From Swiss-Prot:
Biological process, per Gene Ontology: pyridoxine biosynthetic process
GO CC, one annotated term: cytosol
Catalytic residues (UniProt): H43 (proton acceptor), E70 (proton acceptor), H191 (proton donor)
Binding site for 1-deoxy-D-xylulose 5-phosphate: D9, H10, R45, H50, T100
Entry's localization field: Cytoplasm
Organism, as annotated: Gloeobacter violaceus (strain ATCC 29082 / PCC 7421)
Recorded family membership: Belongs to the PNP synthase family.
Catalytic activity: 3-amino-2-oxopropyl phosphate + 1-deoxy-D-xylulose 5-phosphate = pyridoxine 5'-phosphate + phosphate + 2 H2O + H(+)
Name used for this protein in its record: Pyridoxine 5'-phosphate synthase
């Protein structure tokens, strides 16, 4: 079974809604780890709409599992990551007008800039994952950058309506998982995964980690963070 990385961005979203000091993402990370999460993920966006620089700096000192920093492949963000030194970096596409990340990184269309970011980070000992659609061309481009991992974008699977559509999207994810491994890439996945759709993705051969945020934080509003994380771990092995 893959491990579970919990994205705690939306803890910061609630805090930033009132520009106050609570809830504290670092405190949330402690509870999430105590509940059995295998890693903590945060996305430091260029517009700083939720997670702030200081959050990442504190989390780097306090997280006891591993810290995965999602970020754009810009010079400023690479410099920040080189300073903070998270355990992993996941390079993601970013548009200021989007509500959440809407698709995978176009590695093939910007292979020089992505490749440079990968080289700089990995030369500093920070393994890099590329958040990409389950597309053979993007996987091949990802391998050419030298990145250690890809994170498969599961949004189309999560949004598929009807059993046939879901099976089709799951088959694409399975094929991408196999293709990535054949190219020497390690495989994670995430985006839009919930308690109700996670198990089939968790069963894909070679899947190492699932990064899940919104569904867990939404559930935590009702039952608390620790129970929400435990329930997701159970959902990953259900079915």
């Amino acid at each position: 079974m893959p491990t579970l990385g919990v994205n705690i961005d939306h803890v910061a979203t609630i805090r930033q809604a009132r520009r106050t000091v609570e809830p504290d993402p670092a405190a949330a990370a402690v509870l999430v780890e105590l509940a059995g999460a295998d890693g903590i993920t945060v996305h430091l966006r260029e517009d700083r709409r939720h997670i702030q620089d200081r959050d990442v700096e504190i989390l780097r000192r306090t997280v006891r599992t591993h810290l995965n920093l999602e970020m754009a492949a810009t010079r400023a963000m690479v410099d920040f990551a080189l300073d903070v030194r998270p355990d992993y970096v996941t390079l993601v596409p970013e548009r200021r007008e989007e509500v959440t990340t809407e698709g995978g990184l176009d590695v093939g269309g910007q292979i020089a800039s992505v490749g440079l970011a990968v080289e700089q980070l990995q030369c500093a000992g920070i393994p890099v994952s590329l958040f990409v659609d389950p597309d053979a061309a993007q996987l091949q481009a990802s391998a050419r950058t030298g990145a250690k991992f890809v994170e498969l974008h599961t949004g189309r699977y999560a949004e598929a309506r009807g059993e046939q559509a879901q099976r089709s999207e799951l088959a694409q994810l399975a094929a991408a998982c196999d293709e990535a491994q054949a190219l020497g890439l390690r495989v994670n996945a995430g985006h839009g995964l919930t308690y109700w759709n996670v198990a089939p993705v968790a069963r894909l051969s070679g899947m190492e980690e699932l990064n899940i945020g919104h569904s867990i934080i939404a559930r935590a509003v009702l039952v608390g963070l620790e129970r929400a994380v435990r329930e997701m771990k159970q959902a990953m092995i259900a079915g």
